[in-house]
Amino acid sequence: MSLKNKRLTLFQIRPGLVQTAYANGSSTSYITNELGVPVAFTPTGVKHLHHRAVQFPIGVYFEANGHGTVVFDEKTQQLIRTKGGSKLNALMDVINQTVGDAISDMLLVECVLADRDWDCDQWFNCYKDLPNRF
């Protein structure tokens, strides 16, 4: 299983993910080791996550409370607009890069799952959360 999109690989675009210390360690391990995506950590708060995410060509951030989004730098947006194909363009249009939006984020998840021909069970079984120590 790989996150690598052939077009992103072709364009040498490296996405990055930003989490806080509240993220489940299993997700961090899966993202780093299985998907090969670098993970950065920030203090809690969207302002910290967003500031770090914009330092990646494609930055993904989310907090355990559900806040988050995907951001694209200008060069990546231009590359996707001109050479990315209809699917990547459509995904970029769905995303609210400014503040995130739970509805558009879920629509994005649905689009990715449909493209991979996955159901929710397959998605949920990608990795197992580490148990809460409290």
Q: For each of these PLM feature ranges, what is it?
A:
Residues M1-F134:
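Phosphate-binding and adjacent anionic-ligand microenvironments
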